[in-house]
Amino acid sequence: MKVLIQRALNACVVVDGETIGAIDHGQLVLVGIEKGDTEVDTQRLADKLLKYRMFGDEDGKMNLNVQQVAGGILLVSQFTLAAETKKGLRPGFSTAAIPEEGERLFNDFVNKVRAQYSKVETGRFGADMKVSFTNDGPVTFMLD
């Protein structure tokens, strides 16, 4: 499981011309589910995401997590994070979870984040989504 978190001034996801999720200041989180991932992974990464200190304190040091700054979280499934890219010039997706398992684990991850924090929005699993955001910093981290 790979979780790409980006500190955002704002972010939104649009499906079929309709905004289905949007946040102001907070985190845009892209989530890739891989074969072999389990609920243990979703719990570990939900906990880490919520506690990850990527926001500046009064001295500008990355010392605060998303909850401490009352930021929003926009969770978006992105199976391409599970791509194999070491060989060739085209990504392979044999390491990505099958869609049914990916959706189940993505929803489990969403539920675990929401159980600990209320300011959570999501995209739509498997949909053709248009994601827009303003990266603050830029600040981007890969959690796995």
From Swiss-Prot:
Q: Which CDD domains does its entry note?
A: Dtyr_deacylase
Keywords attached to this entry:
Cytoplasm, Hydrolase, RNA-binding, tRNA-binding
EC number from the UniProt entry: 3.1.1.96
Molecular function, one GO term: D-tyrosyl-tRNA(Tyr) deacylase activity
The yes or no answer to whether the keyword Acyltransferase is present is no
Q: What is the annotated localization of this protein?
A: Cytoplasm
User: Could you state one GO cellular component term attached to this entry?
Assistant: cytoplasm
Motif (Gly-cisPro motif, important for rejection of L-amino acids) positions are 137-138
GO biological-process terms attached to the record: D-amino acid catabolic process
* Superkingdom of the source species: Bacteria
**Principal place where this protein is found?**
cytoplasm
In Pfam terms, one family for this protein is Tyr_Deacylase
Q: Which reaction does it catalyse?
A: glycyl-tRNA(Ala) + H2O = tRNA(Ala) + glycine + H(+); a D-aminoacyl-tRNA + H2O = a tRNA + a D-alpha-amino acid + H(+)
Question: What's the subunit arrangement here?
Answer: Homodimer.
Q: Which PANTHER family match?
A: D-AMINOACYL-TRNA DEACYLASE 1, D-TYROSYL-TRNA TYR DEACYLASE
Let me see what the UniProt entry remarks about domains: A Gly-cisPro motif from one monomer fits into the active site of the other monomer to allow specific chiral rejection of L-amino acids.
Function of the molecule: An aminoacyl-tRNA editing enzyme that deacylates mischarged D-aminoacyl-tRNAs. Also deacylates mischarged glycyl-tRNA(Ala), protecting cells against glycine mischarging by AlaRS. Acts via tRNA-based rather than protein-based catalysis; rejects L-amino acids rather than detecting D-amino acids in the active site. By recycling D-aminoacyl-tRNA to D-amino acids and free tRNA molecules, this enzyme counteracts the toxicity associated with the formation of D-aminoacyl-tRNA entities in vivo and helps enforce protein L-homochirality.
Q: Which family does it belong to?
A: Belongs to the DTD family.
HAMAP family, sorted: Deacylase_Dtd
Q: What is this protein called?
A: D-aminoacyl-tRNA deacylase
**Biological source species:** Marinomonas sp. (strain MWYL1)
Q: What is the lineage of its organism?
A: Bacteria, Pseudomonadati, Pseudomonadota, Gammaproteobacteria, Oceanospirillales
